[in-house]
Amino acid sequence: MSKQLIYSGKAKDIYTTEDENLIISTYKDQATAFNGVKKEQIAGKGVLNNQISSFIFEKLNAAGVATHFVEKLSDTEQLNKKVKIIPLEVVLRNYTAGSFSKRFGVDEGIALETPIVEFYYKNDDLDDPFINDEHVKFLQIADDQQIAYLKEEARRINELLKVWFAEIGLKLIDFKLEFGFDKDGKIILADEFSPDNCRLWDADGNHMDKDVFRRGLGELTDVYEIVWEKLQELK
């Protein structure tokens, strides 16, 4: 399968394929935090992220969620549907943590009565600012119907993920999703789902996600390996 690099990101390289509607995503060993300010090469990270994300996306596909995932090609590669990415990070929070706790001056780990969905404008130059529905419409990123769909789909995905992670003894604190338009103009889930873009805590409150790297709490791949081993316990 011939391929040509079309995009190089912080965590993945994206390549063309012989099919104009398909791409290959290659996961890197690079870890970044604070929008790339903190950066490090960590051997084995790409393999673990690809394993975890492929596993989660397969389960989401089976549960009826429309995603870009087609198949896992190798240890670090997966085949995806090509999408036009919507420049929004869709963040869903089940508990207070991270920037939410800083913004509102509250402790981390407080359960939210209703999960909160937030939007962040994907723009590195602006440091991905927190925006609301009206900003999304002003920037012509999405209309009312599309905004409602993104929120509804994030909540639906959350209900699935919460159950799966609870089954393996992990609490899903929050996560970031990205969506895009497929060749037919349908909004589908894209990017990845791994400890890079979610927060997971174990029963003792230990971080099982990229906060280990952000906050210097230990070896990132050790934690990701534990998450991967636990996920394989799911039926």
UniProtKB/Swiss-Prot annotation:
Chemical reaction(s) catalysed: 5-amino-1-(5-phospho-D-ribosyl)imidazole-4-carboxylate + L-aspartate + ATP = (2S)-2-[5-amino-1-(5-phospho-beta-D-ribosyl)imidazole-4-carboxamido]succinate + ADP + phosphate + 2 H(+)
EC class name: ligase
GO annotation, biological process: 'de novo' IMP biosynthetic process; cobalamin biosynthetic process
Tree of life domain: Bacteria
InterPro entries: SAICAR_synt/ADE2_N (IPR028923), SAICAR_synt_PurC (IPR033934), SAICAR_synth (IPR001636), SAICAR_synthetase (IPR050089), SAICAR_synthetase_CS (IPR018236)
Disulfide-linked positions: none
Assigned EC number: 6.3.2.6
NCBIfam families linked to this entry: purC
Protein family membership: Belongs to the SAICAR synthetase family.
Protein name from the UniProt record: Phosphoribosylaminoimidazole-succinocarboxamide synthase
Species for this entry: Streptococcus pneumoniae serotype 2 (strain D39 / NCTC 7466)
Taxonomic placement: Bacteria, Bacillati, Bacillota, Bacilli, Lactobacillales
Name of the gene encoding the protein in the UniProt record: purC
